[in-house]
């Protein structure tokens, strides 16, 4: 065999080896994830706002549930719920005894006179026979299960330090009242309920987060009678007329001290009004998504201070419903002095925000509770996970 033929054979052999190695390398590349795939796998989820970034996307959230007690923002940021208490597991979906609730039921845990972090053993639909009264230093944590409360709402009356998280509350009725377990002592008489999904009265340090609220007889969330230090965040409001009432009457002067934050919530186009409706107090409404309304989005009377910052308002198509705001109980010369301010809001489909007053000089308490607003055009991303989350232990939520 000549030198020329040997060279051809050597060249062919080297080329064949190179192709085989390249094929094997390709197989390895196919098996090993790309850096982007690895990043996505490690993340498992994306947290889009400051509250969610505090706890979401951590695979050990179920083993470290009470870390959520460090995550509140806004005027309810001092709320820790049952962080320093025991874990109480709801094992029964029954609510057949509202006078002496059985251990293992939600009502039993909610009325204990000690800090508790309440979780759920499995998916549950709990048909409440009466309103669910919750005592101080409690967290009702629905993560890891699909938890629905039906017929009865939650009442927080003269309590402190309560978190309500990841609960779906709907189809709430007016219930007759009677003797109801309301604390660690014997059951006490209670009046007929108002038919609110969540009713907060005379209470402070309250945080309502990642709840889905719909179809109540009265309001979805009512806060009144001197309640303060409240944050309502990451919630989805849907299929209802009146969403959020902050201050129940123009004669309830105790609501002058009320401070409430609404952040990262979605108000769907099936909500008509009160998103929120405010009286007397100081309200920061920040980075919420208003997907049309029937009557108005933000309303009020009795000279409340309302700071609307970085919200997205999409007006309904009807030409006479473009106004975001509704002021009642005063003529224009008076309400034009009320401090209703808009900053970096996004107004779409002809939405109109008629500002009034001037930028208020904030007190130390108000400064301490203010949240940093993101630009309004970021709201779809900030609110994309509003409402109840689907969480599984051992995986990012």
From Swiss-Prot:
InterPro entries: AmbAllergen (IPR018082), PbH1 (IPR006626), Pec_lyase (IPR002022), Pectin_lyas_fold (IPR012334), Pectin_lyase_fold/virulence (IPR011050), PEL (IPR045032). Ca(2+) binds at residues 194, 218, 222. Residues 1-25 form the signal peptide. Keywords: Allergen, Calcium, Disulfide bond, Glycoprotein, Lyase, Metal-binding, Repeat, Signal. Glycans are attached at residue 36. Coiled coil: none annotated. GO terms for molecular function: metal ion binding; pectate lyase activity. SMART domains: Amb_all, PbH1. The lineage of its organism: Eukaryota, Viridiplantae, Streptophyta, Embryophyta, Tracheophyta. Pollen and flowers. Pathway: Glycan metabolism; pectin degradation; 2-dehydro-3-deoxy-D-gluconate from pectin: step 2/5. It holds the Pfam family Pectate_lyase_4. Monomer. PbH1 repeats lie at residues 159-202, 203-224, 227-248. It catalyses: Eliminative cleavage of (1->4)-alpha-D-galacturonan to give oligosaccharides with 4-deoxy-alpha-D-galact-4-enuronosyl groups at their non-reducing ends. GO terms for biological process: pectin catabolic process. Binds 1 Ca(2+) ion. Has pectate lyase activity. The N-terminus is blocked. The active site is at residue 274. Its cofactor is Ca(2+). Changing residue 138 to T: Detected only in flower DNA. Belongs to the polysaccharide lyase 1 family. Amb a subfamily. Disulfide bonds join 54-71. Its EC number is 4.2.2.2. This is Pectate lyase 4.
């Amino acid at each position: 065999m000549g030198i020329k033929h040997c060279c051809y054979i050597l060249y062919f052999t080297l080329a064949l080896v190179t192709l085989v190695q390249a094929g094997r390398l390709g197989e390895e590349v196919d098996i090993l994830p790309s850096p982007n795939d690895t990043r996505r796998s490690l993340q498992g989820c994306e947290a889009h706002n400051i509250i969610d970034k505090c706890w979401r996307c951590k695979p050990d959230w179920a083993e470290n549930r009470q870390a959520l007690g460090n995550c509140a923002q806004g005027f309810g940021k001092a709320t820790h719920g049952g962080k320093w208490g025991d874990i109480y597991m709801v094992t029964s979906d029954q609510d057949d005894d509202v006078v002496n609730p059985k251990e293992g039921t939600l009502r039993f845990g909610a009325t204990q006179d000690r800090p508790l972090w309440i979780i759920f053993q499995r998916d549950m639909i709990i048909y409440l026979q009466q309103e669910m009264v919750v005592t101080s230093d409690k967290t009702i944590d629905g993560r890891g299960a699909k938890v629905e409360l039906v017929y009865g709402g939650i009442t927080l009356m003269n309590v402190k330090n309560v978190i309500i998280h990841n609960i779906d509350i709907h189809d709430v009725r007016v219930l007759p009242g009677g003797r109801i377990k309301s604390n660690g002592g014997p059951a006490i008489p209670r009046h007929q309920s108002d038919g609110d999904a969540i009713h907060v009265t005379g209470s402070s340090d309250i945080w309502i987060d990642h709840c889905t609220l719909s179809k109540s007889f009265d309001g979805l969330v009512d806060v009144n009678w001197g309640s303060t230090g409240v944050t309502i965040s990451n919630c989805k409001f849907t299929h209802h007329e009146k969403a959020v009432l902050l201050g129940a009457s123009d004669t309830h002067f105790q609501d002058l001290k009320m401070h409430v934050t609404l952040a990262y919530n979605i108000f769907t186009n099936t909500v008509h009004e009160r998103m929120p409706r405010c009286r007397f107090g100081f309200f920061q409404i920040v980075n919420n998504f208003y997907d049309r309304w029937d009557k108005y989005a933000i309303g009020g009377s009795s000279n409340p201070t309302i700071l609307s910052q970085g919200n997205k308002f999409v007006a309904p198509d009807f030409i006479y419903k473009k106004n975001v705001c509704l002021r009642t109980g005063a003529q224009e010369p008076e309400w034009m002095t009320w401090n209703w301010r808009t900053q970096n809001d996004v107004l779409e489909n002809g939405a109109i925000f008629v500002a009034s007053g001037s930028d208020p000089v904030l007190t130390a308490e108000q400064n301490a509770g203010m949240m940093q607003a993101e630009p309004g055009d970021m709201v779809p991303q900030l609110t994309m996970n509003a409402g109840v989350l689907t969480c599984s232990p051992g995986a990012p939520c």
